[in-house]
Amino acid sequence: MKKLSPAQLCDGMASLGIERNGCMDADLLPLDDGKFMVGTACTVDTEDGDNFPIHVAIYQGKPGYVLVVAGKGYTERAYMGDLMGGAAAAIGLSGIVIDGYVRDKVGLAALDIPVYAKGFMQRSPAKKGPGEINTVVTCAGVKVAPGDLVVGDYDGVTVIPRGRIEEVLAAAEKKGDYELKRRDAIDNYRKCREEGRELPNLAPAWVTEMLQGKS
């Protein structure tokens, strides 16, 4: 799974016509660009900075889950900090995705768990409840159901619908193969230029075809 990036998975879903290509909002960013995330969605529906249902989901969670928190983009409170993140990491969760703000940025980034959020706010979370766990939610613009595959890296987060994982992976692998061929073509062009040999056509076939279609 790690050989396929969220970008390649998005391209795979684009070829299959999946809504938004599974791409969460561009302002949902990782706290640490060096961490790769992959796991099964455990969803949380909450609002107004209330982290009670997030606590419940963490302590009921299992290794391999990615906590997907539909926080409605709330910015007046943090939904969590490094204590909750530390508990999630200790339990073995594979990642945390929050459509809202967090705090304790440095502490969260140092944990052995990928965390994605829309920003930072020092104000403490609310504790109201009840919220909902493992229902279909919309998080950062993408519909997420329990059991969906959630993948993230420095580019952002991608969600693959549970029932379409195999076909998306196949489409993404096809895209990955194409990219390898393009990298080889680019490397070959560079070598030809450096060695003074005849330069091949570097443009992808689709570019040439579109140009010819417009002529």
Predicted feature descriptions by range:
Residues V150:
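C-terminal binding/interaction regions
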Residues M1-P146, I160-S215:
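Feature captures the catalytic cores and cofactor-binding loops of soluble hydro-lyases/lyases
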Residues D153:
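Beta-strand-loop-alpha-helix segment that lines the small-molecule cofactor/substrate pocket
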